[in-house]
């Protein structure tokens, strides 16, 4: 199983002082050096952490793959077509939220999604949709032209009992199998950490996990390389 590291909150820390450090690009290069298979950044409409210049520099400097999380807007599509990340992950976005709070409302926005995906795929940019692990959402993502789905694991991460945890894991497992049978690459992310990631090692239809806040917050105490290694030790098959 691969690990993609989200470096948004390196930028959050930098922006607290509006100075140049810590540099998210430097963090991305360090993450790659220590085992990250990809770098994730979310260019929000309000630019609350990652800035346009960060994205441009990431595209120039990283050597694994660049996953640009973004809202489904004309502005973001234009940026993606210009910067040419390896893939984009389409996420719901609300200005008042602290972090992405759930999966993309794919049923509601299906027609627009289909139109939005095509120019990106025509430029050989992979398209992932951040969805709940549900069969209908998977089918619609594939029908819209996405080649990747990322399952929102926030519900799983908030489970407070063994029964709840087992139910959510089985829901994710079954959804991953369905997605793989449709030819989609399957990623999982949101709320994953050293406290709850271990069972994902056995979910063989999930190829990659995307983790940001848990790694960056842990890195404050033990350093970024060690924080990444903790996760890798738990997910390597």
From Swiss-Prot:
CDD domains: PNPsynthase. SUPFAM superfamilies: Pyridoxine 5'-phosphate synthase (SSF63892). One of its GO terms (molecular function) is pyridoxine 5'-phosphate synthase activity. It comes from the Bacteria. Its EC number is 2.6.99.2. The record marks 150 as: Transition state stabilizer. InterPro entries: Aldolase_TIM, PyrdxlP_synth_PdxJ, Pyridoxine-5'_phos_synth. Pathway: Cofactor biosynthesis; pyridoxine 5'-phosphate biosynthesis; pyridoxine 5'-phosphate from D-erythrose 4-phosphate: step 5/5. GO terms for biological process: pyridoxine biosynthetic process. One of its GO terms (cellular component) is cytosol. 3-amino-2-oxopropyl phosphate binds at residues 6, 17, 191, 212-213. 1-deoxy-D-xylulose 5-phosphate binds at residues 8-9, 44, 49, 99. It catalyses: 3-amino-2-oxopropyl phosphate + 1-deoxy-D-xylulose 5-phosphate = pyridoxine 5'-phosphate + phosphate + 2 H2O + H(+). Keywords: Cytoplasm, Pyridoxine biosynthesis, Transferase. The active site is at residues 42, 69, 190. It is an enzyme of class 2 (transferase). It is found in: Cytoplasm. Gene3D superfamilies: Aldolase class I. Belongs to the PNP synthase family. Catalyzes the complicated ring closure reaction between the two acyclic compounds 1-deoxy-D-xylulose-5-phosphate (DXP) and 3-amino-2-oxopropyl phosphate (1-amino-acetone-3-phosphate or AAP) to form pyridoxine 5'-phosphate (PNP) and inorganic phosphate. Homooctamer; tetramer of dimers. This is Pyridoxine 5'-phosphate synthase.
């Amino acid at each position: 199983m691969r690990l993609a590291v989200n470096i948004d909150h390196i930028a959050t820390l930098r922006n607290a002082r509006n100075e140049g450090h810590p540099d998210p690009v430097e963090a991305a290069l360090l993450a790659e050096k220590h085992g990250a298979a990809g770098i994730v950044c979310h260019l929000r409409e309000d630019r609350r952490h990652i800035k346009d210049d960060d994205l441009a520099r990431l595209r120039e400097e990283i050597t694994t793959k660049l996953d640009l999380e973004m809202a489904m807007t004309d502005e973001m599509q234009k940026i993606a077509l210009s910067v040419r990340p390896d893939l984009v992950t389409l996420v719901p976005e609300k200005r008042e939220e602290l972090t992405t709070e759930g999966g993309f409302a794919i049923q509601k926005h299906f027609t627009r999604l289909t139109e939005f995906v095509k120019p990106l795929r025509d430029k050989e940019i992979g398209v992932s949709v951040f969805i709940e692990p549900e069969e209908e959402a998977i089918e619609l993502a594939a029908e819209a032209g996405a080649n990747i789905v990322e399952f929102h694991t926030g519900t799983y991460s908030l489970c407070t009992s063994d029964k709840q945890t087992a139910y959510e894991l089985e829901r994710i497992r079954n959804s991953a199998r369905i997605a793989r049978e449709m030819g989609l690459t399957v990623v999982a992310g949101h709320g994953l950490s050293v406290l709850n990631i271990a069972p994902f090692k056995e979910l063989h239809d999930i190829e990659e996990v995307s983790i940001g806040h848990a790694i960056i917050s842990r890195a404050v105490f033990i350093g970024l390389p060690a924080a990444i290694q903790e996760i890798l030790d738990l997910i390597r098959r």
